[in-house]
Each structure stands twice: as C-alpha cells, then as structure tokens.
C-alpha cells in the first residue's frame, strides 16, 4: 500500500514541477524583479532575519526568487553568510561561508557554489536562519523541491529556523508530502509573510529551546 502511495506522490510532484517551472520561465522579467524586491524587503524586515547572525541561503538561478540582495545586505550588516556546495559523488551538500558573491563559481547543475575550503565550512554555531529554495510551497510550509533530495537531507540534520521564498501564484493549498518531509517555519511571497509553524496542524516542525 505504501509503495503505491509513494509512487502516486512522486507522479503528482513530477507533474507539478513541470507546470511550475513552465509558469516561472514565462514570467515577465520586470514583474519578476518587482516581486523579488518585495519578497526581499519583507525578509530583511522580518524578525527571522534581524535576530539571526548566520544566514544560510541558496544562490538563485533565473527562475527562482533572487537572493543576491539578501546576500549583499547580510554581509553589509555584519552577518555571516554561507551558501551550499554539492558533495561530489553523493546527494549531500555542505554550506561554506563567503565574503563576496565573487567567490561563487558555476558548478553542479550550473548553479554558483563556494569553494570547498575546510576552514570555512558552516560550523553549526550562532543563531542561523536557512533560506530554503522551492518551486512551490503550501500554506503549512511543505515544499516542492527539484526532486534531487539535497535540501531534504540537509534539513533532516539542521535544527535552526527556516524560511521559504516563493511567488504567490506558485503556492498550493496542500502539497503531497511524506512523513520525513520537513516544512519551513516561515513562508514569504510578494503578498504576505505566513507563520507556518504557528498555524500548522500538530505543529510538525522542529522543536527548539
């Protein structure tokens, strides 16, 4: 029974990924920039950001909510910024601290990544906020990723706060998810900031002190 359910979930997710990628690729560049700016402004004003001293963030591609201004602002604000790098030969990733966008170079899937410098590996200290990429999120904070599992594996070990950035047109009422999927705590679109961890049935997120 579970095998059939998992198969159905994978099939539904695959269809959603295709349609949402298409939707995002057709966004007018000027409209996209306006939405990116609005989402960025909301994030930078949020307590999730102001109370953090470490920002873990994806490096945006063309169809994603841009994170460049977030990275630049966090560095100017004196916060430590770390970006992900895929580990060769696996579906794991590690975060490395950066001091400039110039340190990021195209690598896995053409995404810009930091160098694998052991001295700059994210050390799980401080008060981090992790900005999680997603093609779609639902109102409870569950996400539709790209299907590779990199963030799923990282989030299973990560104990800090999480936020998803998404265009409101890509938000679903409810996404299919498994029992090991971890929802984000906050969801920000160009229209609203949703406190997913406070409204989610059963409060299914990570418990923190």
Where are these regions (language model features)?
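Surface-exposed, charge/polar-rich loops and edge strands
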Residues: 2-11, 22, 115, 125-130, ...
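N-terminal active-site beta-alpha-beta segment that forms phosphate/nucleotide-binding
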Residues: 2-125
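Residue-level signal for inorganic ion chemistry
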Residues: 20, 81, 131, 147, ...
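Receiver (REC) domain switch-region micro-motif
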Residues: 55, 130-131
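Glycine-rich, N-terminal phosphate-binding loop of Rossmann-like dinucleotide-binding domains
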Residues: 59, 134, 191
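Short glycine-rich anion-binding loops that position phosphate/pyrophosphate groups of nucleotides
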Residues: 61-63, 135-139
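Charged helix-capping and loop-helix junction motifs
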Residues: 72, 144-150
